[in-house]
């Protein structure tokens, strides 16, 4: 049930029937209470009590193993002058009581990020067929209301929100990535799973952290100061008028786009734009703007924190392309902030690295490569984090690729391996294990050694976009035979390997002005090693792989997974 309007107790909206509590953790129960001294919570044979202070309370349940269904009873209690708990005429405790039914205990995760995390199951590959067959009473989902600021609309949306069981009538709008992740986790751990969806398409990392967090670093403080300076000089009434006009325009634009796809599901995005026109996204900025700094932190994230969770699944970064040089700072701040908010210094983060995408046919951008590098750095340097590589799951023209099953299942594999510490799981392909500067057949280059490529490299039978299944793979290197691949494919799409040489700035008499320039590299395969070179590069000093917005990750392991991007 939801909070009783006449009750003296008010719990956050996320507490409803069918919720899932985190196993083996001190589950936090918190809220507000009026005209009462104590709050008592009882579940699965345990009773916990805490004092109400300044109208607020917080208590922790003792850790529980996976199980259920249970009832959670939360009571408001008074004491008499001697400090004894008051009882009514029947001898029972006099209290206002809220009872939550069908509560499970298992694994609880929050799903954060932007539109690729948000993309609904019904809109993913084979989505409608999958939705029709979803049925699992032990898999639950709570979607945090998407409202950009604190208002009556948000309070109403929270009142209507609830934990949903996995069944055809509910799963259509669930995150596709999360659904496939959760199904795999359910199968492997054999415990109930609860997901808290807390994401919004088009968002930046700085939307999901506090004002104080952004101000704490000199390279992120400008997000706050520039926004607040703009608001200080803004005519609020005029802003609201512009916002209403934009929202009405946006609704009509979406209708036109939907009509295009309804008429021709295979229509290219460029054709859609010809018909519907470019969207005037993202609309006017201001206090009600969903993309303002620290906005969704206030209207979404803290509305569900500190509901006890194991960790966060995080798929975001596309919109931070132009912030790629500071994205490592932004992502580290976000992890630190969320861990502070949940009072858990080891809150797990399972991060999806950006796939490939670049609709600009005139040039290949680098912003997404910078985001990938930051994501890689964070997951190598911050404890209890995991990175899932999906460079083979992207699409050049569509920023929202619809194969979310591969993404979700790989994310689950890496979560099981890196967060739960279970053997026998791995969602990523070959990883750079070492390298050496060497010369082959007169070419100066770098010999790359990989772990996870002991069986050599494979590629798809048909080198097209989308993830490869194991049945589609053919080995591309024969033992003892040298095979050479150019810097790009037949369509001049780069294969992702680059080699760097050091150029000394004119007039320099020391190494301080040295600069590394990268060139497309030719790849020569021999077993599980790759030798890269460029005929115009002598004295190579570095290499990188996966730094382009869009490249063709043709070298896969025997399970069809791409090489993990690297920078050396």
Model-predicted regions and their roles:
Residues 1-568:
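Cell-envelope and extracellular/periplasmic
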């Amino acid at each position: 049930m939801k909070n009783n309007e006449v009750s003296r107790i008010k719990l956050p909206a996320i507490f409803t029937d069918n919720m899932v509590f985190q196993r083996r953790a001190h589950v936090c129960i918190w809220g507000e209470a009026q005209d009462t001294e104590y709050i008592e919570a009882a579940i699965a044979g345990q009773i916990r009590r805490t004092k109400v202070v300044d109208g607020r309370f917080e208590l922790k349940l003792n850790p529980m193993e996976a199980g259920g269904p249970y009832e959670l009873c939360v009571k408001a209690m008074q004491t008499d002058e001697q400090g004894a708990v008051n009882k009514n005429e029947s001898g029972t405790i006099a209290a206002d009581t809220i009872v939550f039914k069908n509560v499970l205990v298992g694994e609880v995760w929050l799903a954060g990020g932007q539109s690729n995390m948000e993309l609904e199951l019904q809109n993913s590959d084979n989505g409608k067929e999958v939705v029709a067959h979803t049925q699992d009473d032990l898999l639950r989902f709570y979607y945090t209301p998407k409202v950009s600021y604190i208002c009556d609309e948000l309070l109403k949306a929270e009142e209507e929100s609830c934990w949903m069981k996995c069944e055809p009538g509910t799963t259509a709008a669930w995150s596709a990535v999360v659904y496939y992740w959760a199904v795999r986790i359910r199968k492997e751990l054999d415990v109930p799973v609860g997901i808290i969806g807390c994401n919004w398409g088009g968002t930046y990392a700085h939307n999901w952290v506090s004002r104080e967090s952004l101000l704490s670093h000199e390279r992120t403080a400008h997000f706050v100061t520039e926004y607040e300076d703009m608001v200080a000089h803004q005519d609020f009434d005029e802003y609201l008028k512009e916002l209403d006009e934009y929202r009405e325009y946006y609704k009509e634009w979406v209708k036109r786009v939907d009509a295009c796809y309804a008429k021709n599901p295979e229509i290219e995005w460029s054709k859609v734009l010809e018909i519907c026109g470019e969207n005037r996204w993202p609309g006017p900025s201001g206090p009600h703007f969903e993309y303002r700094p620290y906005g969704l932190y206030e209207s979404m994230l803290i509305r569900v924190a500190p509901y006890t969770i194991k960790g966060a699944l995080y798929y975001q970064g596309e919109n931070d392309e132009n912030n790629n040089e500071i994205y490592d700072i932004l992502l580290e701040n976000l992890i630190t902030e969320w861990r502070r908010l949940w009072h858990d210094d080891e809150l797990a983060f399972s991060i999806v690295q950006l796939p490939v995408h670049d609709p600009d046919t005139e040039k290949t951008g680098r912003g997404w490569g910078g985001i990938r590098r930051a994501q890689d750095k964070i997951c190598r340097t911050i404890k209890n984090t995991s990175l899932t590589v999906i460079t083979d799951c992207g699409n050049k023209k569509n920023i929202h690729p619809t194969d979310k099953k591969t993404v979700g299942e790989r994310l689950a594999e890496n979560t099981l391996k890196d967060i739960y510490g279970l053997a026998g799981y791995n969602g990523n392909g070959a990883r750079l294990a070492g390298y050496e500067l060497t010369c082959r057949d007169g070419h100066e280059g770098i010999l790359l050694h990989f772990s996870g490529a002991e069986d050599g490299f494979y590629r798809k039978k048909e080198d097209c976009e989308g993830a490869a299944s194991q049945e589609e793979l053919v080995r591309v290197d024969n033992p003892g035979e040298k095979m050479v691949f150019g810097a790009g494919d037949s369509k001049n799409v780069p294969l992702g390997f680059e080699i760097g040489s050091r150029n000394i700035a004119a007039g320099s008499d020391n190494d301080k002005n040295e600069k590394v320039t990268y060139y497309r590299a030719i790849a020569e395969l021999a077993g599980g090693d790759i030798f890269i070179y460029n005929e115009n590069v002598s004295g190579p000093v570095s290499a990188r792989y996966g730094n382009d917005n869009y490249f063709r990750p043709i070298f896969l392991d025997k399970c069809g997974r791409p090489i993990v991007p690297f920078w050396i």
